[in-house]
A protein has these predicted regions:
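Short, Lys/Arg-rich N-terminal segment immediately upstream of the first membrane anchor
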Residues: 1-5
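Acidic, metal/ion-coordinating pockets
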Residues: 6-389
Length: 389
């Protein structure tokens, strides 16, 4: 038997093993009464970087009417996102309008319909602060905020006025007030406008500590988003770990990170709690890419992180419950109309392949899906896979 044949058979065997395991760990949720956390009062979903490279923009364009449709990109994950009370992603492109040119890397400007597609997929809140937020200058910041709001999305991290910047975004969900704060390490060398530096939240420890103190007064939970770290590195730096501990101790309840474009671990930092107790707060250093055209190792995948909160029976105090995730993969493929991109929830996609329910998934795609599942489970070994309620 030749080497190539042996490799093919080994790959098919790996897919078969993974497919056999998929239903057992994904498709049934255990009785909440048996959970150590109890029934959640709040379930949040967090996705990673939303990027539109040039091939994605071109693929979304309808040549008959020159309109751009990104909704099919997210159709497969829409049911998952709808199981959350609130869903978030990092909008790592600007929406500055067609007159400035729709472009991918290195200076991103996506069609405004991207925001509508994200809203339709189930997202409620987006971060607009990242190293690409000035890719069309100051006016691009304002236009992005305008188009995001028109789509019905809430945003944070970039602002029009000083007053906006000093008023944290607070969203009430199920009677619980959530504050969102966001910061970026860089704007890729593009300077902030003189006298209006407030339009972009830069990653500054003193600024963040002051904002955390303000947000704690306005909300029950504070979610801190940080665009940080080293691109394509699968583990956080010591500096990130130190910052995470500092900010969690200062009042953040949860840290969500992005920028590396690969999944990094989720850690739990021990923090002093009331009544001389100790609790663990999560930091997701990087959720990877939610959608992009990157194809370097590990950049074609990401996770949707689900974080649940429960109410303590005696005190009514909010407490973190289960933290789980669904690995995702960007499927780049051709159908009868040409090139397409779509985000697939990996376990569901593997099950669909096993049952022959997805005509666009071939053996090569199934092999990569199986690899993503194995890679992610190994990298996030302390976390369970999310089970739909």
């Amino acid at each position: 038997m030749g080497k190539q044949v042996r490799l093919i058979l080994a790959g098919l065997l790996a897919i078969t093993i993974v497919l056999a395991l998929v239903p057992a760990f994904f498709f049934s949720r255990s009785d909440p009464a048996l959970s150590p956390y109890g029934t959640p009062v709040l379930r949040l979903a967090f996705a990673g970087d939303v990027l539109t490279h040039q091939e994605q923009i071109d693929a979304a364009r309808n040549p008959e009417n020159n309109e751009y449709d990104f909704e099919p990109c997210f159709a497969a994950v829409k049911p998952l996102l709808k199981t959350a009370d609130l869903a978030f992603c990092d909008l790592e492109v600007v929406l500055a309008g067609e007159e400035t040119g729709y472009t991918g890397y290195p200076c991103f400007n996506a069609p405004e319909s991207l925001a509508t597609a994200l809203k339709g997929a189930g997202f409620d809140v987006v971060s607009t602060v990242n190293n690409h937020c000035l890719d069309r200058g100051e006016e691009g910041v304002y236009r992005t905020l305008e188009h995001v709001a028109e789509a019905g999305l809430l945003s944070f991290g970039t602002y029009r006025t000083w007053e906006e910047r000093n008023t944290p975004l607070v969203v009430e969900v199920n009677g619980i007030k959530l504050a969102f704060l966001g910061y970026t390490y860089s704007t890729n060398g593009i300077p902030l406008p003189e006298g209006r530096e407030y339009i972009v939240n830069m990653l500054d420890e003193d600024l963040i500590l002051a904002d955390l103190a303000r947000a704690r007064q306005a909300a029950d939970l504070v979610i801190l988003y940080l665009h940080w770290g080293n691109e394509y590195m699968r583990f956080p730096s010591p500096e990130q770990e130190a910052m995470a501990e500092l900010f969690l101790k200062a009042g953040a309840d949860l840290i969500i990170g992005s920028h590396p474009h690969v999944v990094q671990p989720v850690a739990f930092i021990k923090i002093a709690a009331p009544e001389n107790k100790v609790e663990e707060k999560p930091v997701a250093y990087s959720l990877g890419n939610f959608i992009s055209d990157q194809r370097m190792p590990y950049t074609d995948s990401g996770i949707i992180l689900f974080v649940e909160f429960v109410s303590e029976a005696k005190t009514g105090r909010l407490k973190q419950g289960e933290v789980s995730y669904v690995p995702t993969w960007v499927h780049k493929y051709y159908d009868d109309n040409g090139l397409n991109f779509r985000v697939l929830p990996v376990p569901q996609a593997l099950e669909n392949y096993r049952q022959g329910k997805d005509q666009w998934l071939d053996a090569g795609s199934a092999e990569r899906l199986a690899e993503v599942l194995a890679e992610t489970r190994k990298h996030l070994s302390s976390l369970p896979l999310y089970q739909e309620p």
